[in-house]
């Protein structure tokens, strides 16, 4: 009897040892795979497929959407105790406001159908009770906005929105597209969720413009508005300095290069051109980045061809571009951040355009801040223009929205606050009319 017990114990010990050895071998193999330069592996190689199965097929980011927003709202508003309150053009205020209303928008942005709506319908809904507004600059896919807020909007990759308004009184969602068109859908949020958002929301008193001015009815007019912003001046960037940000290593990595990639210098070493068998990365010390590759062999992919489609494919491409931008901004030690502004989709190609933001305010230049072109999920080109700004002691009060609305003429339009270059290298804040192209 005792001999049988000893035999069972010995067998259990042997099995445990075998399992431990197998686990150790697996961990060693996984660690070896992690250490490989997967970016340089052919996509159809056995090692690349093994790495992709264990750690995901994308280089530097996950295939599944991260849920991190690629676009930043510029205005948020919510009715609290019968009074509309809003926040605008401030990163700190905007982050707190988004946290307060996220659950509300998660419920509102769950649907699949939109129908054309009239300005009169929107104006009536704005007067019918509590409302919430979420506004971006540019064209943001409705499905992406829904995902960032925790909702799901079916086929939302096909409509690009600028402003979203939830009218609780009429239980409708209104969306304003980037070209000024207006759509609506039935929407409803739980009373408890709305009340929770109202308790957490903080902002300044404001109201909707309604039908009083030649601007969109949902335009926010703040009471006694004094939006004071500093003048900005360009500061020099040197990406090749040993003291510059995270250095070039991370920047090279997100573009699929190693720290030891071959390069040649131009313009007295003010430009370095990194090359491998399939792609080229041109880096200027002053902050201009230009990447080019062939779709068939690129090492930077948002997803493998045929893996995903629709909103999931768009989400993956936005994540890929956003993470590259994050690495570039760190390398340049800039004090700006990026926000998705426009999307172009044609056949198998997707183009993403990003705004540069300073403290939550867009900075507009002669050229786009960042542009990414994908083909079937493969990054084929990218251009990024890094800048660093110094806030001057002098500030300027931006023209209040109420005065700008009073001066609007013609067809209804939107309003935008942004920095524009003026007088050499100085950037001055101002409020602009957003007219739709005929």
Predicted regions and their residues:
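Preferential activation on post-signal-peptide N-terminal prodomains/segments
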Residues: 2-5, 16, 20-22, 26-314, ...
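N-terminal membrane topogenic signal
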Residues: 10-15
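Short low-polarity hydrophobic stretches
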Residues: 24-29, 320-321, 370-372
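Short small/polar-residue motifs
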Residues: 160, 255-264, 275-280, 332-341, ...
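Beta-strand-connecting loop/turn residues
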Residues: 269, 286-287, 348, 376-378
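Segments that shape or occlude catalytic/ligand-binding pockets
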Residues: 300-308, 312-364, 383-438
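Transition segments tied to proteolytic processing and entry into folded domains
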Residues: 364-386
């Amino acid at each position: 009897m005792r001999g049988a017990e000893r035999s069972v114990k010995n067998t259990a010990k042997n099995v445990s040892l075998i399992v431990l050895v197998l686990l150790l071998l697996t961990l060693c193999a996984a660690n070896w795979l992690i250490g490989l330069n997967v970016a340089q592996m052919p996509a159809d190689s056995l090692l690349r497929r093994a790495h992709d199965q264990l750690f995901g097929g994308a280089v530097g980011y996950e295939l599944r959407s991260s849920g991190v927003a690629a676009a930043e709202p510029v205005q948020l508003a919510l009715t609290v105790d019968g009074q509309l309150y809003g926040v605008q053009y401030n990163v700190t205020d905007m982050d707190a406001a988004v946290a307060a209303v996220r659950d509300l928008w998660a419920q509102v942005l769950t649907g699949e159908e939109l129908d054309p709506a009239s300005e009169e319908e929107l104006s009536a809904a704005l007067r019918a009770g509590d409302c919430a507004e979420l506004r971006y600059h540019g064209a943001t896919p409705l499905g992406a906005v829904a995902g960032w807020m925790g909702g799901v909007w079916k086929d939302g990759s096909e409509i690009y929105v600028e402003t979203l308004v939830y009218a609780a009184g009429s239980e409708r969602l209104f969306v304003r597209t980037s070209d000024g068109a207006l759509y609506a859908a039935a929407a409803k949020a739980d009373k408890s969720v709305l009340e929770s958002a109202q308790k957490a929301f903080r902002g300044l008193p404001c109201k909707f413009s309604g039908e009083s001015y030649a601007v969109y009815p949902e335009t926010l007019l703040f009471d006694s508005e004094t939006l004071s912003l500093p003048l900005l001046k360009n500061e020099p960037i040197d990406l090749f300095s040993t003291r510059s940000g995270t250095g070039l290593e991370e920047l090279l990595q997100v573009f699929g290069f190693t720290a030891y990639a071959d390069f040649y210098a131009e313009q007295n070493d003010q430009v370095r051109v990194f090359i491998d068998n399939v792609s080229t990365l041109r880096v200027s010390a002053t902050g201009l980045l230009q990447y080019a590759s062939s779709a068939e062999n690129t090492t930077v992919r948002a997803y493998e061809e045929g893996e995903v489609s629709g909103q999931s494919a768009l989400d993956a491409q936005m994540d890929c571009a956003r993470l590259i931008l994050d690495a570039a901004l760190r390398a340049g030690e800039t004090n700006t951040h990026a926000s998705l502004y426009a999307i172009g989709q044609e056949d198998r190609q997707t183009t993403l355009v990003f705004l540069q933001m300073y403290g939550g305010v867009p900075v507009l230049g002669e050229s786009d801040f960042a542009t990414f072109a994908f083909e079937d999920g493969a990054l084929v080109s990218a251009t990024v223009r890094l800048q660093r700004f110094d806030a001057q002691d002098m500030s300027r009060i931006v023209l209040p929205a109420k005065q700008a609305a009073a001066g609007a003429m013609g067809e209804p339009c939107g309003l935008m606050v942004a920095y524009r270059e003026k007088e050499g290298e100085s950037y001055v804040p101002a409020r602009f009319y957003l007219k739709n192209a005929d």
